[in-house]
């Protein structure tokens, strides 16, 4: 199995969450809308897809999709008419027309006679107009319709959206649940070491099996730390990161900020709050008080704005965008 082929497998560390959802369905207690919240790389969307496949399968075996019925065949080909996947398309935003399509989708009768399911990921990509439009779907659920919103930063969602969804929070799993899975992917590096470097985030650990990804990440973390120490200026920082695309720089900074913020969330256990990765731990030491954490949260929002801007038709100056982000990063500890 290649690294890209885990899209609908049941990830071992999510088995209990899956079984909980199946039990709710079997007891006729399934809510009409769920919000899967947690760090990027935990497999939240993988779980959402797997559960959707189970709900649509006409002949599940041991509470798993059979993989052989007509519904499973349609799902495998990505053409099942009763499953709608909403993700950013030509930009980093989920636009209002995509949500309007959802409104039409839920108003129609199921084409295959079962559930109608909408998966939205990442939900924080909803812009203000699409978020407001989604409220209509959440406020007026139709029978046998399920919405699952997947979010890496649930607090960025409108409070009215969060209040209309049943929240399921996902934390980093124990290493013993992940290491055998990583080893099954035929990686060359030590699974335990990759997981340690990824701070117990499984899909990120799999990504780090690519040695270039580890190197690129270390370079950016070093630049971010030097900025906070005042050892380099913004122009120098941008110059050291010019070798990477702006999209990659933004994604790496989002992961970094997300990790530090997650470390300070009460929902994480003491074990998973510990940042094992040396360079990331050094960065986290700068964010020990509420004011700086609030500033870091604001920086994450600036990253989201930048990601939207570079995907728009306005074609901003990419170097200026990167320098602006480094300025915002430096300002988080002022």
Question: Which ranges hold each PLM region?
Answer:
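Clamp-loader machinery-focused feature within the broader ASCE/P-loop NTPase space
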Residues: 2-129
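Helical "lid/switch" subdomain of P-loop NTPase nucleotide-binding domains
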Residues: 98, 118, 122, 126, ...
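Conserved catalytic/switch belt of AAA+ P-loop NTPases
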Residues: 107, 132-149
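Conserved adenine-binding aromatic site and its adjacent loop/helix in ATP-hydrolyzing domains
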Residues: 104, 136, 159, 163
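Charged, glycine-rich active-site and insertion segments that engage polyanionic ligands
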Residues: 1-53, 71-74, 143-146, 152-334
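Short, surface-exposed loop and linker segments with low hydrophobicity and enrichment for Pro/Ser/Thr
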Residues: 125-128, 135-139, 240, 244-247
């Amino acid at each position: 199995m290649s690294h890209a082929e885990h899209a609908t497998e049941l990830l071992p560390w999510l088995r209990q969450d899956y079984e909980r959802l199946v039990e709710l369905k079997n007891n006729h207690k399934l809510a009409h809308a769920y919000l899967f919240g947690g760090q990027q790389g935990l497999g939240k969307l993988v779980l959402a897809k797997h559960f959707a496949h189970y709900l649509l399968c006409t002949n599940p075996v041991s509470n798993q999709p059979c993989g052989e019925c007509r519904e499973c065949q349609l799902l495998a080909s990505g053409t099942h008419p009763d499953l709608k996947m909403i993700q950013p398309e030509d930009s980093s935003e989920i636009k209002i027309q995509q949500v309007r399509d959802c409104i039409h989708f839920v108003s129609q009768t199921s084409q295959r006679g079962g559930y109608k399911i909408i998966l939205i990921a990442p939900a924080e990509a909803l812009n203000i107009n699409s978020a407001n439009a989604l409220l209509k779907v959440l406020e007026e659920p139709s029978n046998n319709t399920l919405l699952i919103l997947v979010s890496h930063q649930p607090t960025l969602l409108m409070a009215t959206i969060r209040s209309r969804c049943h929240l399921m929070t996902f934390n980093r799993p124990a290493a013993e649940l992940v290491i055998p899975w990583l080893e099954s992917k035929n990686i060359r590096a030590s699974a335990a070491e990759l997981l340690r470097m990824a701070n117990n985030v499984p899909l990120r650990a799999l990504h780090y099996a690519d040695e270039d990804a580890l190197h690129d990440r270390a370079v950016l973390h070093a630049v971010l730390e030097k900025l906070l120490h005042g050892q380099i200026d913004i122009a120098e920082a941008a110059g050291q990161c010019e070798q990477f695309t702006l999209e990659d720089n933004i994604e790496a900074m989002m992961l970094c900020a997300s990790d530090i913020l997650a470390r300070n969330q009460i929902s994480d256990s003491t074990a998973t709050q510990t940042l094992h990765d040396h360079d990331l731990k050094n960065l986290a030491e700068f964010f020990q008080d509420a004011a700086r954490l609030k500033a870091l949260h604001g920086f994450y929002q600036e990253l989201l704005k930048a990601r939207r801007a570079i995907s728009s038709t306005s074609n901003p100056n990419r170097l200026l965008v990167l320098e602006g982000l480094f300025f915002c990063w430096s300002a988080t500890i002022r």
